Amino acid sequence: MAIATQPASLTTGETIDLWSAKSMKVMKDEWPRLRCRFVNADPVGRWDDFILSEWEMEACGWEDFHPHSETNFLVEGELYIESEGKTVILRPGDSARVNPGQLGRYWAPVYARMVTVYGPNPQGAESHSFRYYEI
């Protein structure tokens, strides 16, 4: 099985790396209240750098298992995160990380907008166990 890869480093070698703005999109048509945009790369295959993204959730929840760390910084609203029986509630300015190899559950009873950083995934292991639900 071939594994899709991205460059080992997402940097361009230039003095400044610039990623132009793009709008957030619904992840899938059947998940209308979950929107995102990946800023510097798509989380496909392996990567040795970080991946930056922005997410919005409107009265919905999401869970997935990821092989890399996932750090969320809440910009607006209120976000609940649960992993391994521990739950935290983020308010604007708060951040939390689900560490590699964990199932993370994220939900916004009303609305949440967050900036997310995926840590390195040098083996290219895939995220899985996706579940979307509306509140």
Predicted regions and their residues:
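Double-stranded beta-helix
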Residues: 46-49, 109-135
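Short acidic-glycine-tyrosine-enriched beta hairpin
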Residues: 85-101
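A short, N-terminal "cap"/entry segment at the start of jelly-roll beta-barrel domains
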Residues: 1-54, 134-135
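Short, conserved beta-strand element in jelly-roll/cupin
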Residues: 56-57, 65-82
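Short beta-strand His + acidic residue motifs that chelate non-heme Fe in jelly-roll/DSBH
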Residues: 63-64, 81-82, 98, 104-109, ...
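Well-ordered beta-strand positions in beta-sheet-rich domains
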Residues: 54, 87-89, 103-105, 111-113
